[in-house]
Swiss-Prot record:
Reaction(s) catalysed by this chain's protein: an N-acyl-L-alpha-aminoacyl-tRNA + H2O = an N-acyl-L-amino acid + a tRNA + H(+)
Chief location category: cytoplasm
Organism: Cupriavidus necator (strain ATCC 17699 / DSM 428 / KCTC 22496 / NCIMB 10442 / H16 / Stanier 337)
Residues that bind tRNA: Y15, F66, N68, N114
Enzyme class: hydrolase
GO molecular function, one term: tRNA binding
Annotated family: Belongs to the PTH family.
Keyword Hydrolase on entry: yes
Localization of this protein: Cytoplasm
Protein name in UniProt: Peptidyl-tRNA hydrolase
Site residues (Discriminates between blocked and unblocked aminoacyl-tRNA), renumbered to this chain: N10
Complexes and interactors: Monomer.
GO biological process annotation, one example: rescue of stalled ribosome
InterPro entries: Pept_tRNA_hydro (IPR001328), Pept_tRNA_hydro_CS (IPR018171), Pept_tRNA_hydro_sf (IPR036416)
Amino acid sequence: MIKLIVGLGNPGAEYEATRHNAGFWLVDQLARMGGATMRVEGRFHGLAARARLWDQDIWLLKPSTFMNRSGLAVVSLARFYKVLPDEIVVAHDEMDLPAGAAKLKRGGGAGGHNGLKDISAHLSTQDYWRLRLGVGHPRNAPGGAGAGREDVVNFVLKPPRREEQEAIDAAIDRCIEPLGLLARGDAERAMAQLHTTR
């Protein structure tokens, strides 16, 4: 069962269209589907809404703390509504997957993602679900960009190219049905369906 879906990103118009905000894009799509309006919730350090999705009430959250402090928002809402870590899905950008790919997994390390690191620290566990939305990697980008720290930061804080954006949007659409399966407690089918469709 899933009770909370968190999308990671950075607040502000200047970041809205950047690769790092792929998690926000997924949550926005779910809010539209569930007829929910994301509202500023100071006690949860972000925008939150309760949406009716897959015949269940599910909290949606977009932290407004900036990526590296996302854990504060997640733990605030989770504690208030008594949501357990394994009832949380965190959707985030993933450079180790090409644009248009999506993978679902439970637990594991942060893979260098500072938002995940902070969430794990605040929850005192890594045992929550992650929906990894591929955005590609600078070493594979046209123009021969490198893979140093500065290249990575510049890459995730820029908008994807048009064809990449279309691929990411399509991946988000493909995630909806598997998320519904996961929300209803069928994790095995959710992962099988997401990982075999493209």
